Regions:
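Tandem CBS (Bateman) regulatory domains
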Residues: 36-72, 76-85, 103-119
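A glycine-centered beta-loop-beta connector
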Residues: 17-20, 25-43, 84, 92-108
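The conserved cystathionine-beta-synthase
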Residues: 3-22, 27-29, 70-88, 95, ...
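Short hydrophobic/aromatic-rich motifs at helix boundaries and adjacent loops
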Residues: 14-19, 31-33, 51-53, 63
Length: 119
């Protein structure tokens, strides 16, 4: 899981995504009263590429999802999958004691649920 500042331009965020081999980034809170945000590859595709915007001229704040739904580390996988389905999301920060400790996605849910049974 990688955190970035919302003032970062999208091109720089993409370079970070490529470097850490992730399709999502956590956007840091500006202060204690702020909420976490998320930037997904799909946000970049919809808000930058599809609208023919220059990624070096668009800030992460302009296209990120915020506030975003969060999950607790102890949430059961099946409930997390239902939450994703109910709210039409594919990724969520995992927050423990007001600190982001990871990111969960449909991809990771499937890997943790089905693949262990196949081994």
């Amino acid at each position: 899981m990688t955190e970035v500042d919302g003032t970062l331009d999208v091109l720089s965020a993409l370079k970070i995504m490529k470097e850490v081999n992730e399709t999502s980034l956590i956007v840091k809170r500006r202060d204690e009263g702020d909420e976490f945000g998320m930037l997904l590859f799909s946000d970049i595709a919809k808000e930058v590429i599809a609208k023919d915007r220059a990624p070096e001229r668009v800030s992460v704040y302009e296209i990120m999802a915020k506030p975003c739904l969060t999950v607790r580390p102890e949430m059961q996988i099946r409930y997390c999958a239902r939450l994703f389905d109910n709210f039409g999301i594919s990724h969520a920060p995992v927050v423990d004691h007001d600190k982001v400790v990871g990111i969960v996605s449909y991809y990771r849910l499937v890997l943790q649920t089905i693949l262990p049974e196949l081994e």
